[in-house]
Curated annotation (Swiss-Prot):
It comes from Cutibacterium acnes (strain DSM 16379 / KPA171202) (Propionibacterium acnes). InterPro entries: Ribosomal_uS10, Ribosomal_uS10_CS, Ribosomal_uS10_dom, Ribosomal_uS10_dom_sf. Involved in the binding of tRNA to the ribosomes. It holds the Pfam family Ribosomal_S10. Transmembrane segments: none annotated. This is Small ribosomal subunit protein uS10.
C-alpha cells in the first residue's frame, strides 16, 4: 500500500467522545508503524432551532435549542496491511460517526 493514504473523518455531538475516539485511532495506527497527521479539528457545525413556548398564542415567548456537531480529520500516511486490519477491529463508541476514504 505504498504511496497511498487513508483519510478518516469523525463526527459527534459530544467533543469529549470524539477526542477520545481520535486518540484511540492515533494510538492504534502509530503502534502498527504508519505515520499519522492529525487529529485536525474542523469547524463545529451549529444548528439553532427556535420554538414557540406556548401551544396557542404568546408568539413573543420563544425558546432556542442548539445542536453542535464536532468534527475531526485524521490522515494516515503510508498505511500497512496491519494498519488496515487493526482499524477494522477497533471498537469505538456508538455516538461517533466514522467516514473512511481512500483518495
Amino acid at each position: 500500500m505504498a504511496g497511498q493514504k487513508i483519510r478518516i473523518r469523525l463526527r459527534a455531538y459530544d467533543h469529549e467522545v470524539i477526542d477520545s475516539s481520535a486518540r484511540k485511532i492515533v494510538d492504534t495506527v502509530t503502534r502498527t508503524g504508519a505515520k499519522v497527521a492529525g487529529p485536525v479539528p474542523l469547524p463545529t457545525e451549529k444548528n439553532v432551532f427556535c420554538v414557540i413556548r406556548s401551544p396557542h398564542k404568546y408568539k413573543d415567548s420563544r425558546e432556542h435549542f442548539e445542536m453542535r456537531t464536532h468534527k475531526r480529520l485524521i490522515d494516515i500516511l503510508e498505511p500497512t496491511p496491519k494498519t488496515v486490519d487493526s482499524l477494522m477491529r477497533l471498537d469505538l463508541p456508538a455516538g461517533v460517526d466514522i467516514e473512511i476514504k481512500l483518495p
